């Protein structure tokens, strides 16, 4: 069970970092 918790925390941390960078520096998407 601990492995599941650690995996969840790892994904959550990576998600927070990703969104922080994403919103701080908006991507330049060209349609």
Curated annotation (Swiss-Prot):
Function: Found at the monomer-monomer interface of the photosystem II (PS II) dimer, plays a role in assembly and dimerization of PSII. PSII is a light-driven water plastoquinone oxidoreductase, using light energy to abstract electrons from H(2)O, generating a proton gradient subsequently used for ATP formation.
Matching SUPFAM superfamilies: Photosystem II reaction center protein T, PsbT
Its membrane topology: Single-pass membrane protein
Family (UniProt): Belongs to the PsbT family.
Quaternary organization: PSII is composed of 1 copy each of membrane proteins PsbA, PsbB, PsbC, PsbD, PsbE, PsbF, PsbH, PsbI, PsbJ, PsbK, PsbL, PsbM, PsbT, PsbY, PsbZ, Psb30/Ycf12, at least 3 peripheral proteins of the oxygen-evolving complex and a large number of cofactors. It forms dimeric complexes.
Name assigned to this protein: Photosystem II reaction center protein T
Residues that span the membrane, as ranges: 3-23
Organism domain of life: Eukaryota
Keywords: Chloroplast, Membrane, Photosynthesis, Photosystem II, Plastid, Thylakoid, Transmembrane, Transmembrane helix
Species in which this protein is naturally found: Tetradesmus obliquus (Green alga)
């Amino acid at each position: 069970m601990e492995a599941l918790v650690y995996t969840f925390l790892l994904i959550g941390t990576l998600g927070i970092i990703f969104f922080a960078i994403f919103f701080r520096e908006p991507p330049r998407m060209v349609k």
